[in-house]
């Protein structure tokens, strides 16, 4: 994410080390507090990119994760700013145009990476080759700990769910609460 100092002339990208569990969330909360107390501002081009460990994913988990995110994308878009919705953002492309059958027929991560060849997708599979992570790029830049924590928890639950199943097409937010 690009963030600006209070005079809006000094921009920088903030990259955290690997954060895990409650300890990681506590560290993140402290960083967000420091950024806020320094009057750091986020510009409109910012994105929050979250890498989640994918080292132990099997092909079923990968397929389920992509299908679930794709099927829930329209609902996820509803809690994102307009600049991060649909396929209009160059840096976080939509998954909607990719046929379910192509995702289901992939035999390994390389085939899925071939189907989603750009890293500039809401779900970036290219990160796996280098970092052994799946990168989620849809969220807008923020220094709000609450927003980041909620997004990370949502993604964690989606990954947990993907290890056992996938969401059907046409899912609604109300359905996700059940």
Model regions: which residues?
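Short, small-residue-biased leader/transition segments that mark boundaries at the very start
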Residues: 2-5
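Histidine-centered divalent-metal-coordination microenvironment in nucleic-acid enzymes
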Residues: 11, 41-57, 131-137
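Aromatic/basic-lined ligand-recognition segments
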Residues: 11, 62-140
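The substrate-binding groove and active-site-proximal loops of carbohydrate-active enzymes
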Residues: 13-22
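Helical (often loop-to-helix) elements that flank the catalytic cores of nucleotide-handling enzymes
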Residues: 21-32, 55-81, 144-159
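Catalytic micro-motifs at enzyme active sites that drive phosphoryl/nucleotidyl and oxygen chemistry
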Residues: 34-41
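Flexible helix-coil linker/hinge segments at domain or subdomain boundaries
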Residues: 43, 74-88, 160-178
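Long, repeat-rich segments with strong aromatic
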Residues: 129-134, 138-167
